[in-house]
Amino acid sequence: MNDSELKACLESIVDPELGRPLGELGMLRQATNIDGTPRVLIELPTPAYPRQDRFQGLVDDAIRSQFGNTPAAQLDITWNVKGNESGGKIGLRVKNVIAVGSGKGGVGKSTTAAMLAYGLHSFGAKVGLLDADVYGPSIPHLCGAGGEPGVTEHRGADGNVMQRLQPIEKDGLKLLSVGFLVKADQAVVWRGPMLHKLLTQFMQQTDWGELDYLIVDMPPGTGDVALTLSQLLSLAGAVVVCTPQKVALLDAVKAISMFDQVKIPVIGIVENMTGDIFGRGGAREHAEKTNLPFLGEIPIDKSIRELGDAGRIADVLSDACPVRDDLLTVCQNIAMQVAKEQLESPELPTLEIL
């Protein structure tokens, strides 16, 4: 077996999650035969790829079915998040911007957004969390973060000096919220143009660095923020959060309609607070009716409320938290759905950064 034969053999393996050959997906990065032992490198499209240990068996079975009894392959697995830098000419270097929205308040949207951000970070991704709920910012409290964003000066290619906000960093996440700019008990009473200006600054004049995912906590309902984001960015998509009962589902339908109208693709639906109090399965049923992916359930559990109240929402990822596995499954489903869309979409040309 030479290297070309080995490569051709492995390129035909069908990815168990994406349903396409590794060669077609560009995931086989190396295949060499060194003294009779296959050396293989596979690059996954996200660190949140589920059950990565399956690849050892898939690789060994493919090699042995074609070349007979051979030593087990020395398999290395790496990852590179797929995505198109979403900022275009505003200079935001983020591979995937994901909006988290709902049709109404009270369904745990902000808590879910924060948990998703920390969940994706726990797999090794570089993640930011933007609180776009300007009238009711809760991300600073949920994450236990405080202080004011710093300001640094950058000199552009034209020689002009620009000021950029520095996100607050907490437990590995980069955070930004109007809650860092006003007192905790101060209401933000702004009209739409002021809201648009602030969000533009949060995107265009903030030093986010290079991120794999930027999670945007949307305000409840439908309105200005979705319009602003659709005008500024090319989003990977939106996650709609709702609870199982019908009254929440009715408003989730409106959120889905809003994202459709502003040309933001809907990644799928997450059912939050699943359990005996609110019931279960309503979001899954609606996802099936609308042909949208159902991304999973997050059970109703007092630990989420306690950790959020204490400013320790990151601790939902601790082994002791009863919802940890459910949350990680939702994160994996979101990451894989985004990866599927990116792999199926043609690459966009790189835009000039002004």
Say what each PLM segment does.
Residues 1-29:
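N-proximal, solvent-exposed amphipathic alpha-helical segments enriched in charged/polar residues
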Residues 10, 28, 63, 94, ...:
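Residue-level signature of catalytic and energy-coupling elements of molecular machines
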Residues 24-27, 32-101, 331, 342-345:
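Extreme N-terminal, non-catalytic leader segments
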Residues 97-133, 256:
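Walker A/P-loop phosphate-binding motif and the immediately C-terminal alpha-helix
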Residues 120-185, 196, 203:
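Phosphate-binding loop that captures ATP/GTP phosphates
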Residues 150-153, 178-194, 200-228:
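Switch II (G3) loop of P-loop NTPases
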Residues 205-208, 212-310:
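Conserved catalytic-core segment of NTP-binding enzymes
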Residues 310-324:
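C-terminal boundary of histidine-terminating zinc-finger modules
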